Amino acid sequence: MEQYTTNPEEFYKSLKKNLDLNHDFPGNYLYKFILTNHDEEKLGELYQVFDDLEYSLTTKESSNGKYLSVTISCFVLDSNHVIKIYKDVSKIEGIIML
């Protein structure tokens, strides 16, 4: 997939197209995030994005303890729902979205 660092809307447009072509909706979608400093406040903010959704979550701390990997499998309705969640998470400073 192409990366758009200067224009997020172009990135999301491309992501939507790829999701519509390659993913069956409604269904589960796998999100992966990395917290850069294992900040409990940021982790709480991430959980709040998924509060009203059906999801399962796993976490794994890096070997040096500096990072926390968070994997969330979430039931989504369509590609717009996937993108809305990504946009909500993007507002949390210090979280890397994979």
Predicted regions and their residues:
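Long, contiguous binding/interaction regions
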Residues: 1-69, 75-98
